[in-house]
């Protein structure tokens, strides 16, 4: 028996890549090849050479003198595991076709593992504490013994039904650009843990490994690279379009989830399903996706639109071999992409030293990365990186772009349409004498989940869509609130209610107050010309909504002497969190006419993040001049009580804040004092 097996997801690449240099032979890599890379360099080179010859025949502008390297180039086979073709060879125990389940008991991982092989084969002992795994997956590790791959499964705290649903979904999805499912195994660990093993076809490598190959950056193969990138984009879009059309969200699209397959003298790119979900919009994975869309970052939700965000960033990494955004900074997308939106905020961020820091901008980031990316892709990337999910294109919309219409000149006609998904296979599994039947089914679904469609402010509404939330202390017997609409109870925050001063981080000063039977955490931004920017605003939203189980409310705007003050607050259990940001923007612009005072209900947060600061100031001035105080039932608001003192920066500050608690956490209060 030869070959190796891939369990559940692509084999993981080593943590560090060889160093890069610019020698006379062109930009390439030096150093030791990654030992555990599931990569066949000779097969890659064969595809490269064959594809390049086909490109040369069609691209007449390549000088004849530049084609001699084809005969002089000698491929070097990298050490490590070499796979040929796309076949999968594995233990007979796991050869389940077309779709069956096998219950097998395994030992705890900290002890020696005995893999019982079917049909009388001897037991192979693997010591997980000393033997080095040749590959590691999310739920399984693979060990090599006598040139044979053996699987050690990791117990999971999952129900049999969840395992069955995952395998059922994978088995019923079939497309030329999805990694093909070969079989599944459901197991029970001796201590009661549930595990699942999903067998899929094995390609040459994943995309992250592919772009680390010397061939990818060699100047000789520039024309192959240009064509391959275009085909990579089309193949992955085709796979995502099929998933989205059938109500499946990938959830963690990245380079490790794109598998490279050789097809004659060409490459085919297939999407590995990973931990896809059958829901239109689903709770985020237990581990954060590599490319987190804004709605995932701030609401913990994953939808099709998040897949398109991740697709654009993954393709950019394939083009440039580097990430577009810096990791670990949730405000990055807003600093870079904020100016791309309609009527973007034209205010300046202020650093710790008070110097203005302008938003970076999309084009500036491209220049900083020093990359020459195909202009055709940059246009699509910009569309997919819209901050608001409802503005991003779908995979189907991108596939009709002219960029992908000319691929047939080299690669032939497009892939045949996938077969129609049939009825669910009659499969069941019995665990502890309790039978479970999967009720999962592939179903068509709209292009966008209604919980994110046509929303001005996706953060507040997406969280609200998850479920109704009622702050418990508002409705507790003998508590602060009154269930009758319109009744509000005021809480005043002052120096007397201050319990502790937490400190200042990222220009946010944090204080904890105790008033009215509730703990109130107040975040304040203070500084010379503390103008709000999109990055500052969204950072406070991040602070206020760092956990999906917390309900965010964006509450109250009021006008001080020369400052406009924005508050962001959220409530969880018996704790009220509020954030204050100061704006020292004079109100000089006249407001447009047309507001009906009797029915006025203004979402200033939505106006601010979609129409810009100048337009928002017009609205605020109109509200102030008309003395309008529109507060629906259940409103939560913050207003300044004593905006009289001045701080050392010369701007107005407030010694006390009044918090008005009402009945509806999602309703805004607008008006003036």
Curated annotation (Swiss-Prot):
Superkingdom assignment: Viruses
GO biological process: signal transduction
Catalytic center residues: 252
Domain Protein kinase: start-end pairs: 128-404
Record-linked InterPro entries: Kinase-like_dom_sf, Plant_MAPKKK, Prot_kinase_dom
Record flagged with keyword Oxidoreductase: no
One annotated GO molecular function: ATP binding
One Pfam family named in its UniProt record: Pkinase
Region (Disordered): 340-364
Basic and acidic residues bias: start-end ranges: 345-355
Family: Belongs to the protein kinase superfamily. Ser/Thr protein kinase family.
Protein name in the entry: Protein kinase ORF74
Organism: Ictalurid herpesvirus 1 (strain Auburn)
């Amino acid at each position: 028996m030869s070959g190796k097996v891939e369990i559940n997801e692509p084999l993981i690449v080593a943590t560090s890549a060889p160093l890069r240099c610019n020698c006379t032979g062109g930009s390439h890599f030096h150093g030791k090849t990654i030992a555990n890379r599931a990569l066949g360099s000779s097969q890659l080179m064969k595809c490269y050479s064959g594809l390049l010859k086909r490109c040369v025949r069609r691209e007449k502008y390549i000088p004849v003198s530049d084609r001699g390297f084809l005969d002089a180039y000698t491929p070097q086979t990298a050490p490590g595991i070499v796979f040929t073709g796309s076949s999968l060879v594995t233990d007979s125990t796991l050869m389940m076709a077309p779709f069956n389940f096998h219950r097998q008991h395994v030992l705890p991982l900290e002890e020696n593992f005995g893999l019982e092989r079917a049909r009388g084969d001897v037991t192979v002992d693997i010591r997980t504490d000393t033997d080095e795994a040749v590959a590691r997956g999310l739920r399984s590790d693979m060990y090599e013994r006598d040139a044979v791959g053996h699987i050690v499964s990791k117990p999971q705290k999952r129900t049999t039904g969840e395992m069955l649903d995952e395998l059922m979904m994978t088995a019923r999805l079939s497309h030329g650009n999805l990694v093909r499912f070969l079989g599944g195994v459901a197991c029970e660990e001796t201590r009661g843990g549930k595990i699942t093993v999903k067998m899929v076809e094995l390609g040459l490598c994943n995309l992250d490994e592919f772009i680390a190959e010397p061939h990818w950056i060699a100047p000789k193969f520039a024309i192959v690279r240009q064509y391959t990138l275009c085909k990579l984009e089309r193949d992955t879009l085709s796979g995502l379009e099929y998933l989205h059309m059938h109500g499946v969200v990938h959830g963690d699209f990245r380079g490790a989830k794109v598998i490279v397959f050789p097809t004659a003298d060409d490459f085919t790119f297939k999407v590995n399903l990973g931990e896809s979900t059958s829901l239109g919009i689903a709770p985020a994975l237990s581990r954060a996706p590599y490319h987190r869309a804004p709605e995932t970052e701030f609401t913990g939700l994953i939808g099709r639109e998040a897949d398109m965000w991740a697709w654009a960033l993954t393709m950019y990494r394939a083009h440039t071999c580097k990430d577009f955004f810096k990791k670990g900074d949730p405000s990055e997308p807003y600093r870079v992409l904020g100016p791309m939106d309609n009527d973007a905020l034209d205010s300046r961020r202020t650093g710790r030293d008070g110097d203005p820091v302008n938003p970076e901008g999309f084009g500036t980031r491209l220049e900083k990365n020093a990359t020459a990316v195909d202009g055709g892709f940059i246009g699509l990337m910009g569309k997919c990186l819209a901050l608001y999910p409802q503005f991003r294109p779908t995979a189907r919309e991108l596939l009709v772009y002219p960029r992908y219409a000319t691929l047939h000149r080299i690669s032939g006609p497009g892939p045949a349409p996938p077969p129609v998904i049939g009825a669910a296979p009659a499969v069941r599994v019995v665990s502890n004498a309790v039978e479970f039947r999967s009720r999962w089914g592939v179903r068509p679904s709209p292009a966008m989940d209604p919980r994110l469609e046509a929303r001005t402010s996706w953060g507040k509404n997406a969280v609200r869509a998850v479920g109704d939330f009622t702050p418990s202390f508002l409705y507790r017997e003998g508590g602060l609130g009154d269930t009758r609409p319109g009744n509000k109870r005021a809480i005043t925050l002052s120096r007397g209610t201050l319990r502790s001063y937490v400190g200042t981080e990222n220009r946010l000063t944090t204080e904890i107050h105790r008033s009215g039977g509730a703990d109130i955490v107040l975040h304040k931004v203070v500084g010379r010309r503390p103008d709000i920017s999109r990055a500052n605003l969204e950072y406070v939203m991040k602070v206020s909504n760092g956990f999906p189980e917390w309900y965010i409310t964006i509450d109250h705007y009021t006008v001080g002497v020369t400052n406009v003050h924005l508050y962001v607050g959220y409530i969880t259990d018996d704790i009220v969190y509020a954030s204050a940001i100061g704006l020292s923007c004079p109100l000089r612009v006249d407001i447009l006419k047309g507001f009906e005072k009797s029915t006025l209900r203004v979402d200033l947060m939505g106006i601010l993040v979609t129409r810009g600061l100048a337009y928002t100031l017009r609205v605020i001035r109109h509200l102030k001049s008309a003395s309008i105080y529109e507060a629906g039932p259940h409103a939560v608001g913050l207003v300044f009580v004593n905006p009289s003192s001045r701080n050392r920066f010369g701007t107005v500050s407030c010694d006390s804040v009044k918090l008005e608690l009402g009945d509806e956490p999602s309703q805004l209060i607008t008006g003036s004092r």
